[in-house]
C-alpha cells in the first residue's frame, strides 16, 4: 500500500514529538537523543479505524538548524523563512505533491504573540505553495500550541493565540487540554486524534462494513435523536447549539470555499450528535 504523508514543523520545545507520538499511538518511534536536532525524522506507522486502514509517514522538521543555540524571535523568523524558501523550491516539489497534512507547532509560553502572528503569515504562504492553478490542495493544516512539561500559560494568552490562528483561517488546538468543551467539541489531544482519523486520506484501504450492522447503528441513532427531541431534557440547551453555530461562522470567515464546505459538514454532524 502506498503511504500517506504529513509534515510536523516547529521550533525546538514546541511539541513536535508529543504530537507525532499521539498520532502514531507511540508506536514505531525511533530513539532520539536529547540534544539532537529533530529535522529529518521520519516515523513510519499505520492507522486503522472501523472504516479504513492506511500506512502513514510522519515527517518532522525543525528550525533553526542549531538546536542548542539561543535565538531571538527575529532570528527564528529568518530561519523559518529560509526553511520555506527551500520547501517551495523545485527540489521539494515531489514532497509537496504527496503531503496530506501540515501541523505547525508553537510554544505558547516561550513564543511571543508577535512571533506567532508573523510565523502564521509564513504558514499561509506554505498553504498557497501546496496548491496549483488547476486544483486546490485537499489536505489539512492545524496549528498546535503546547508548553514544556511543568510550565503553564494563562487563559488570556491562549485566547489571544487562538484568535490569531483563526484570523489566518487555521484551526487551533491547545495540546494541554483534552476531552470535550462546552460546545460538545473534542479538544486538545482528543481533537488531534479526531482530526487524523476523520481526514479523507489519499491512499486508503476501505474496510468492508456489515450492511446489517450499519443499518442497526443508523436506526439506533435515529431512535436516540427522536427520544432526545421528544423528551424535555435539561441537556437539550438550544443556546449551546446557537453558540456553536456562531463560533463556527466566525471561524469559517477566512476559509476557502472548499474548507468552508468541509467544516460545515463537520459542524452539522456534531450538532446532530448533540441533539
Swiss-Prot record:
The answer, when asked if Repeat is one of the entry's keywords, is no
Top-rank lineage group of the source organism: Eukaryota
A Pfam family cross-referenced in the UniProt record is Adaptin_binding
Checking InterPro entries in the record gives: Irc6 (IPR034627)
GO biological-process terms attached to the record:
vesicle-mediated transport
User: Member of which family?
Assistant: Belongs to the IRC6 family.
What is the name of the protein in this document? Increased recombination centers protein 6
Q: Which gene encodes it?
A: IRC6
